[in-house]
C-alpha cells in the first residue's frame, strides 16, 4: 500500500479535511495507520473534536481500541477536551472507558481534572471506575479537588467516590483542600464524611495542611 496515501489520510483527519479523507479511504488508505508515535487518524480527529471525521472513520471499521506509544486511546483525547458526542460514539463503538495510559491515567481522570462535568457524568454512567488510581495514587476525585472543579467533585461524591482515598504520599482530598486554603471546599468535604484524623506518610493530619484560612470554627472542626 502507498505510504503516501496513509500519511495524507492522517493529515486530513488531523485538519478536518473531510473530502480528502473520504478520497484517501476510497483509494485504499489504511484507516488504522499509525505515525511514528503510534497515533492514529481516530486519535487525531477525536482530540480535536472533528465529529464528521470520526463518523467517517467509524463507518470504515476503524479500531477504536488502538493505543499510541504512551498507551493513550482516542477516547482519552476526546474526554480530556470535553467532546461529549465523540465520547458517546467511541464508547458505543467499543472503547474501553477504564483503559489507562502508561502513567495509569484514565479518560475519567483527564475529564475530571479539566472540569468536563458532562463527560465525567457520561463515563461514570457507562462504567468508568471512579476509584482507579494512577501511578501517583490519584483518583479522579483527587484530581478534581486539586483543580477546584466543584461540579465534578459534587457529582463524583454523589455517585459514591471514596472521599478518603489516599495517594502515594498518603494525602486525602481533605488534606489537598486544606493545603489550597479553600474553606468552602473543606466544609463540603467534611459534610461528605471526609476523615479529618487520617494521617499521611509523614504523620500529618488535615489540620497540619491548613493554609491561608482564618476561620477558627473550621480549625476546631479539623482538630
Predicted regions and their residues:
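Ankyrin repeat A-helix N-terminal signature
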Residues: 11-16, 44-50, 77-83, 110-116, ...
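Ankyrin-repeat-protein effector appendages
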Residues: 1-8, 126, 159, 191-195, ...
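Ankyrin repeat structural motif
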Residues: 17-25, 50-58, 83-91, 116-124, ...
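Intrinsically disordered, low-complexity regulatory segments in ankyrin-centric signaling systems
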Residues: 1-27, 36-39
Amino acid at each position: 500500500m502507498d505510504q503516501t496515501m496513509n500519511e495524507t489520510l492522517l493529515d486530513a483527519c488531523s485538519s478536518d479535511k473531510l473530502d480528502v479523507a473520504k478520497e484517501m479511504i476510497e483509494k485504499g488508505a489504511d484507516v488504522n495507520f499509525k505515525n511514528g508515535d503510534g497515533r492514529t487518524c481516530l486519535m487525531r480527529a477525536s482530540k480535536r473534536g472533528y465529529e464528521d471525521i470520526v463518523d467517517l472513520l467509524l463507518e470504515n471499521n476503524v479500531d477504536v481500541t488502538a493505543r499510541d506509544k504512551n498507551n493513550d486511546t482516542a477516547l482519552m483525547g476526546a474526554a480530556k477536551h470535553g467532546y461529549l458526542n465523540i465520547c458517546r460514539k467511541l464508547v458505543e463503538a467499543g472503547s474501553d472507558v477504564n483503559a489507562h495510559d502508561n502513567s495509569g491515567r484514565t479518560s475519567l481522570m483527564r475529564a475530571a481534572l479539566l472540569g468536563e462535568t458532562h463527560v465525567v457524568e457520561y463515563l461514570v454512567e457507562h462504567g468508568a471506575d471512579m476509584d482507579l488510581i494512577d501511578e501517583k495514587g490519584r483518583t479522579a476525585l483527587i484530581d478534581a479537588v486539586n483543580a477546584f472543579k466543584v461540579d465534578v467533585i459534587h457529582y463524583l461524591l454523589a455517585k459514591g467516590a471514596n472521599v478518603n482515598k489516599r495517594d502515594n504520599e498518603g494525602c486525602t482530598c481533605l488534606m489537598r483542600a486544606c493545603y489550597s486554603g479553600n474553606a468552602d471546599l473543606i466544609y463540603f468535604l467534611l459534610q461528605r464524611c471526609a476523615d479529618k484524623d487520617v494521617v499521611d506518610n509523614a504523620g500529618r493530619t488535615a489540620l497540619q495542611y491548613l493554609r491561608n484560612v482564618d476561620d477558627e470554627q473550621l480549625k476546631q472542626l479539623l482538630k
